[in-house]
Amino acid sequence: MSEDRPSRSGDGNKILYCSFCGKSQREVRKLIAGPSVFICDECVELCNDIIREELEEKSQSARSSLPKPKEILEVLDQYVIGQQRAKRTLAVAVYNHYKRIESRHKNDDIELAKSNILLVGPTGSGKTLLAETLARLLNVPFTIADATTLTEAGYVGEDVENIIQKLLQKCDYDVERAQHGIVYIDEIDKISRKSENPSITRDVSGEGVQQALLKLIEGTVASVPPQGGRKHPQQEFLQVDTKNILFICGGAFAGLDKVIQQRCTEAGGIGFGVKVKSSESKRDVGKVLAGVEPEDLIKFGLIPEFVGRLPVVATLDELDESALVKILTEPKNAITKQFKKLFEMENVELEFRQDALSAVARKALKRKTGARGLRTIVELVLLDTMYELPSQEGISKVVVDESVIENKSEPYLIYQTMPAKVASGE
């Protein structure tokens, strides 16, 4: 309020005072009126300084708590076996992404662009697990979306805005937290367009979805209804800025290795791609995928604009038998450790022989399900035992060997020393 502004009662001679510092309107440049209170320009500046200092302290605290790439890699190593190249790429990309968010609070002419990530690897190689572990490490909201369920707006299926809706649900509709979250879009290869040439007809679940995802991934303000969908047109929409949300897209991209080999062959055999003689060689296929270029992804069926918004590409190798055996035993939440914990709750020790672990790995390789199929195999083998065990007494140990995995025998049950009256048949 200016100095010559009349009082609320209409008495122009009444002197007004700041409700916070007590200075009169004659001692300050400006006095702003509110409902029964006044605040001067000096108090407004002081409030701004306090808020600015708190933001800087919060930024410094976040920076100190942000794990370094080596620390990120160490945590990933605890949960994901192998895939060192992909883990290093992810560690650096995630670290740079959150450094970029912190840099927004500084007065700098250089604006850092967002680097979303594309994970390319066979099914069951650890793509989803990598994304989940990163989100858990960074303590940020995380959601998984299935690209095959997405369609263009106006068609039956999920709109791309539903992805942000799921992210909001994960953090109880805290918009600020959601704007720093991680979104993993699975099966991204399934929305590739049907041919390399632009479609002249509607492809609502392929190229159309890629077009719809462009702005969301790059950064836009999405209007999301709190209760989802468009069933409540009268409700107030939440405005979520996606420019600081990290998008990780993953897919198996079956056949991409052949596209890469064809490019290398047409180029006169330059590079390691020409060394691949058979697509059945798992190691060689992994090496071929490591040489993926944007043009290969475009030829596979992703539109150029979409590929351009996923500048960081990490490729995963197909898992061999030794890697699958390690996955069964080494990670913090390894499958065998989980089942041993379940049996411990019944006061029974569970033992997996080495030949059993190898048999499980071979079975998963034969089914071509990767690490994802390991749990199914172990679950089926132990199903009858887990059904009977709670009702039985005196069992101290259950042993699983190769013959059990091959369904040639039941798990071996080792009993404790029976009480005398039980042994006598009473």
From Swiss-Prot:
ATP binds at residues 122-129. GO terms for cellular component: HslUV protease complex. The keyword Cell inner membrane does not apply. Zn(2+) binds at residues 18, 21, 40, 43. Keywords: ATP-binding, Chaperone, Metal-binding, Nucleotide-binding, Zinc. It comes from the Bacteria. Belongs to the ClpX chaperone family. This is ATP-dependent Clp protease ATP-binding subunit ClpX. It comes from Xylella fastidiosa (strain 9a5c). The lineage of its organism: Bacteria, Pseudomonadati, Pseudomonadota, Gammaproteobacteria, Lysobacterales.
